[in-house]
C-alpha cells in the first residue's frame, strides 16, 4: 500500500474524491460530462490513486458499493494486475487515458457508462459480478478477455471499439455464467449498437445462458492480425469478422440485424437454440457452419427450406463442401416435425456431395468414362427417386414416359406400322388382303368390325406404352401388336424403342422399390 503523502500535492478532483468516496452517492467531478483531452485539475485523477483506493487505502475507505465516479479524467495506467479487489468499479462519463490492466485480477464488477477508454486488458481476470460497457462508450484499443471468468452478464451495448490494428474484442476461452449481449440490450427501452473496427473473437468461449449478437457493425482493418499464420477463413484468419468457433451457448444464440462484411465463423460451435436471419439485406456475410450444432430453432426463426438452403450455401468460396451442416439442419427440421423439408435438405446435400465427388474425380483423373458413369448414375438417381428421398418421383417419371411413348406409338399406328404380333395372322389371306387394299393402315382396317380381326385385341397406344414401361403388369398389348420394320421409319424406330423403354422401366421400378424399402441408403 502506498502512503497518501506519496501523491502530494493532490489535485482538487482527488481531494474531492477522497473526502466523498465513503458516502453512498456517486462522486461527480465538474459538471459530470465526459472531459476533453485538455481537461483541468478540477476533474483530473491519477490512476495510481484509484488503485490504492480500490485495494484499501485505510484512511479513506470506499463505500460498500465500490468506486463510483463520474466526469473524471483519469491519467496513467489503472494497473490492477494480479490483485484481489473486492470492490465494483463503476465509471460514468470518464476519460481513461491509460490502459486498464486487469490481467489475472479478481474483481466484483466492472461498469463503464459513456466513457472513453484507451484499452482494456483483462486476460484471465475473475469477475464475481458483471461486466458492462454501455451508454455510447468508446474504446480506442482492444478489449482483451482471454480466459476471463464473468459471474454475471457481459454487455457491450452502445459501444464503439477501434481495435487500433488489433482485434476489437479478443476473448478466447471466455466463460460467462450469465448471458452475453453484444450490440442491443433487448430488455431495455430503445435500441443500442456495437460498432467495431476489428474482429470479435470469442473462439472456445462458454456462455451458460443466452448470447445476443444484434445491431452489430463489424469492419476489419486493412492489415488484420493472423493473415500470415492462418488461412483467410481459418481460426483467426484475415477474413474472419466474428468468431464463435467451438463456443458453447447454453441458451439461445440470437444473431440478427447486423452489418458484417466478412466471414462469421460458427465452426464447431454448439448452442441449445438458434435464431438468425437466413436471408435479407443483413444476411449477406459468408458463414462457416461446418461442425455447428444446434438442438432447436427459436419458434420465431425462419425454417423454410428455401431460406435455410440459401443460408447453408453462404459458405466462403475457398471452403470445400461439407455435408455436416445439411445433415444437422435436416436433423433439427425432422425433430420439429418438418419431415418433408428435412428430406428436401438431404436431397440437396446428396446432389452437392455427388457434384463434389465428380469435381474431385475430374481433378485427379480428368473427364473420362468413370466420370461420365458417375454423372449418368447421379442424374438417374436424382430425377427418378430424388436420391431415395422422393420415391414418388418414379411414378411421375413413369407417367411422363408412358405419355410420351403413347403419343409416339399412336403416330406409328396412324402410319400403318403396327401389325399383329402373331406369325399365323401375318401369313393369313385376310391380313394379306388388308395390306393390299389399305396399305396406309392395314391394322386399323383388319381389326375393325366386320373384318377378320374384329375379335383381336383392340390396339391402345396408352396401354401399349404402359405394357412396355411397367414390367410387372401385362396389359396384353405387347402380345397382340408389334411395330413393323418393313414399312416407314416410324416402325423401325418403334421396334428399337421398345427395348429402351423396357430397360428404363425396369430401372425405374427397381429404383422405386429400393427407395421404398430403404435399400438406397439415405443417411
Question: Which residues are covered by each model-predicted region?
Answer:
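A sequence/structure-level signal for intrinsically flexible, low-complexity segments enriched in small
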Residues: 361-368, 394, 406, 410
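Membrane-interfacial segments
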Residues: 412, 416-420, 517-521
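Hydrophobic, well-ordered secondary-structure elements that form the walls
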Residues: 342, 408, 516
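Long, positively charged binding patches that form subdomain-scale interaction surfaces
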Residues: 380-408
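C-terminal substrate/ligand-recognition segments
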Residues: 397-401, 405, 499-523
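N-terminal leader/targeting and pre-domain segments
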Residues: 1-377
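Pore-loop/selectivity-filter region of tetrameric P-loop cation channels
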Residues: 373-391, 415-504, 511
Amino acid at each position: 500500500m502506498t502512503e497518501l503523502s506519496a501523491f502530494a500535492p493532490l489535485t482538487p478532483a482527488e481531494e474531492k474524491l477522497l473526502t466523498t468516496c465513503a458516502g453512498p452517492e456517486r462522486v461527480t467531478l465538474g459538471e459530470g460530462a465526459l472531459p476533453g483531452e485538455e481537461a483541468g485539475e478540477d476533474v483530473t485523477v491519477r490512476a495510481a490513486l484509484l488503485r490504492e483506493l480500490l485495494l484499501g487505502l485505510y484512511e479513506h475507505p470506499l463505500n460498500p458499493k465500490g468506486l463510483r465516479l463520474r466526469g473524471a479524467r483519469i491519467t496513467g495506467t489503472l494497473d490492477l494486475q494480479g490483485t484481489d479487489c473486492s470492490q465494483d468499479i463503476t465509471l460514468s462519463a470518464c476519460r481513461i487515458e491509460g490502459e486498464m490492466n486487469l490481467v489475472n485480477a479478481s474483481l466484483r464488477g466492472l461498469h463503464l457508462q459513456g466513457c472513453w477508454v484507451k484499452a482494456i486488458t483483462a486476460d484471465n481476470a475473475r469477475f464475481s459480478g458483471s461486466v458492462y460497457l454501455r451508454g455510447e462508450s468508446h474504446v480506442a484499443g482492444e478489449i482483451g478477455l482471454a480466459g476471463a471468468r464473468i459471474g454475471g452478464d457481459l454487455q457491450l451495448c452502445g459501444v464503439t471499439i477501434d481495435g487500433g490494428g488489433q482485434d476489437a474484442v479478443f476473448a478466447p476461452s471466455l466463460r460467462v455464467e450469465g448471458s452475453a449481449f453484444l450490440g442491443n440490450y433487448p430488455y431495455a427501452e430503445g435500441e443500442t449498437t456495437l460498432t467495431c473496427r476489428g474482429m470479435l473473437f470469442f473462439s472456445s468461449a462458454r456462455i451458460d445462458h443466452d448470447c445476443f449478437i444484434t445491431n452489430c457493425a463489424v469492419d476489419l482493418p486493412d492489415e488484420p492480425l493472423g493473415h500470415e499464420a492462418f488461412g483467410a477463413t481459418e481460426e483467426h484468419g484475415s477474413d474472419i469478422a466474428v468468431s464463435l468457433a467451438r463456443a458453447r451457448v447454453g441458451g439461445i444464440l440470437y444473431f440478427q440485424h447486423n452489418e458484417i462484411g466478412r466471414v462469421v465463423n460458427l465452426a464447431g460451435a454448439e448452442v441449445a437454440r438458434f435464431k438468425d436471419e437466413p436471408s435479407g439485406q443483413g444476411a449477406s456475410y459468408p458463414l462457416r457452419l461446418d461442425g455447428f450444432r444446434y438442438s432447436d430453432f427459436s419458434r420465431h426463426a425462419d425454417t423454410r427450406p428455401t431460406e435455410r438452403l440459401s443460408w447453408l450455401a453462404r459458405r466462403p468460396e475457398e471452403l470445400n463442401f461439407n455435408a455436416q451442416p445439411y445433415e444437422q439442419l435436416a436433423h433439427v427440421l425432422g425433430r420439429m416435425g418438418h419431415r418433408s423439408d428435412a428430406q428436401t435438405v438431404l436431397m440437396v446435400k446428396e446432389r452437392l456431395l455427388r457434384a463434389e465427388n465428380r469435381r474431385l474425380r475430374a481433378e485427379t483423373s480428368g473427364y473420362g468414362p468413370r466420370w461420365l458413369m458417375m454423372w449418368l448414375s447421379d442424374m438417374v438417381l436424382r430425377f427418378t427417386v430424388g436420391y431415395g428421398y422422393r420415391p414418388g418421383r418414379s411414378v411421375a417419371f413413369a407417367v411422363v414416359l408412358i405419355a410420351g411413348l403413347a403419343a409416339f406409338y399412336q403416330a406409328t399406328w396412324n402410319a400403318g406400322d403396327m401389325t399383329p404380333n402373331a406369325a399365323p395372322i401375318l401369313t393369313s389371306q385376310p391380313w394379306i388382303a388388308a395390306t393390299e387394299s389399305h396399305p396406309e393402315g392395314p391394322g386399323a382396317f383388319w381389326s375393325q368390325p366386320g373384318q377378320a380381326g374384329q375379335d383381336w385385341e383392340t390396339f391402345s397406344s396408352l396401354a401399349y406404352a404402359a405394357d412396355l414401361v411397367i414390367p410387372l403388369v401385362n396389359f396384353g398389348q405387347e402380345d397382340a401388336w408389334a411395330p413393323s420394320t418393313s414399312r416407314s421409319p416410324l416402325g423401325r424406330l418403334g421396334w428399337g424403342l421398345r427395348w429402351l423403354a423396357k430397360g428404363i422401366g425396369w430401372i425405374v421400378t427397381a429404383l422405386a422399390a429400393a427407395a421404398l424399402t430403404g435399400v438406397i441408403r439415405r443417411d
